[in-house]
Regions:
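Soluble non-cytosolic domains of exported or imported proteins
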Residues: 34, 116-120, 185-189
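Short, solvent-exposed coil/turn segments at beta-strand boundaries
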Residues: 38-42, 67-71, 150, 171-178
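N-terminal "mature-domain start" segment
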Residues: 22-59, 136-140, 147-150, 201-241
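A mature extracytoplasmic/lumenal domain signature
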Residues: 32, 41-43, 49, 78, ...
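N-terminal signal peptide c-region/cleavage motif recognized by signal peptidases
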Residues: 16-17
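Conserved polar/disulfide-associated segments of primarily extracytoplasmic proteins
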Residues: 51-165, 169, 239-242
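Surface-exposed amphipathic alpha-helical segments
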Residues: 43, 94-99, 103, 125-133, ...
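Bacterial N-terminal signal peptides that target proteins for export
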Residues: 1-10, 43
Length: 242
C-alpha cells in the first residue's frame, strides 16, 4: 500500500506540474508594431497584406499561436502610409472626379483626405468588424470598449460550423489597426488572460497608458492633442475655463 500511495502521489505531482507548465503564458512585445500581449507560446509571425474599404493594399503582420485550448492571434495593419497612396491615386484621377480624388486640400481634407485615405483610416475599425460579421457566425456581444484607454470594438461570436467561440477586440492606435482574435472550442472558458493583456508600447518598448480615452480618428490624425500619459501633468485649461 505504501508503494501504491507513493506512485499515486508522485503521479499527482507530475500531473499538477504538467498542468501548471501548460498554463504558463508568455508576454510578447513588439516595438515595431507597438503592442504587447500574452500568448500561450512564442507566436508565429506572418507578413501579409490588408485590403482596406477604399481598396488600398496595406502591409500587415499576423502574430499567431495555437494550443489544444484555442487559436490566438494579433493582426496589425499599418495605415501610416495611406495618405501617400491617396495622393498618388488622387493625382491620377480625371479632373473634377471627386469620388476618386477625395479632398486633397481644403476644409474637408482632415475628414476625407486625398483619395478618401483619411476616411479610410476613420473607417478602419468598423470595416474590420464588418468583415467578421460577414462570416457564418451568430453575434452574441457587440460593444464599444477600451483597452489601456484606447477605444475599440469588442465582439463575441459563435461560429455556426462547429459552435466554437470567437472573442475579438479591434482597435486603432497611431494609425495602426489591431485585431485581437481568440477562438476556443465549444464549451471552453473565455480566453480572459489573452483578452485582458493587450497593451500599447512606444518605439523603445515602454508601455503607453493615457489619462483619458484615446480615439485614433481624433488623436491619431492629430485633430485633437493626444491625451497626456499617466504620470504627466494634465494640460492647462484655456483661460476662463473652470
Amino acid at each position: 500500500m505504501r508503494a501504491t500511495r507513493f506512485v499515486l502521489a508522485f503521479t499527482t505531482v507530475v500531473m499538477a506540474a504538467s498542468s501548471v507548465a501548460a498554463q504558463e503564458w508568455i508576454e510578447y512585445q513588439n516595438k515595431d508594431d507597438g503592442f504587447k500581449v500574452v500568448f500561450p507560446n512564442e507566436p508565429k509571425i506572418t507578413d501579409t497584406v490588408w485590403t482596406t474599404e477604399q481598396g488600398y493594399v496595406l502591409p500587415a503582420r499576423v502574430y499567431s499561436a495555437e494550443t489544444s485550448s484555442g487559436r490566438y492571434s494579433m493582426t496589425v495593419v499599418d495605415y501610416t502610409g495611406i495618405e501617400r497612396l491617396g495622393m498618388e491615386r488622387s493625382q491620377k484621377c480625371p479632373v473634377g472626379a471627386e469620388t476618386c480624388q477625395g479632398q486633397p486640400a481644403g476644409g474637408l481634407r482632415p475628414v476625407i483626405g486625398p483619395g478618401y485615405a483619411t476616411q479610410d483610416i476613420r473607417d478602419a475599425i468598423v470595416y474590420a468588424t464588418f468583415k467578421y460579421l460577414q462570416k457564418d457566425v451568430r453575434v452574441t456581444e457587440y460593444l464599444w470598449n477600451w483597452q489601456d484607454l484606447v477605444e475599440g470594438h469588442q465582439l463575441q461570436l459563435t461560429n455556426t460550423a462547429d459552435q466554437s467561440r470567437t472573442y475579438l477586440y479591434i482597435s486603432m492606435h497611431e494609425n495602426k489597426l489591431y485585431i485581437q482574435d481568440a477562438t476556443v472550442p465549444k464549451g471552453y472558458p473565455e480566453p480572459g488572460l489573452f483578452q485582458q493583456s493587450l497593451g500599447y508600447v512606444d518605439k523603445d518598448g515602454n508601455g503607453i497608458r493615457y489619462q483619458a480615452i484615446y480615439s485614433n480618428e481624433f488623436h491619431g490624425l492629430r485633430i485633437d492633442p493626444v491625451p497626456p500619459l499617466a504620470g504627466q501633468p494634465p494640460p492647462a485649461l484655456p483661460a476662463g475655463a473652470r
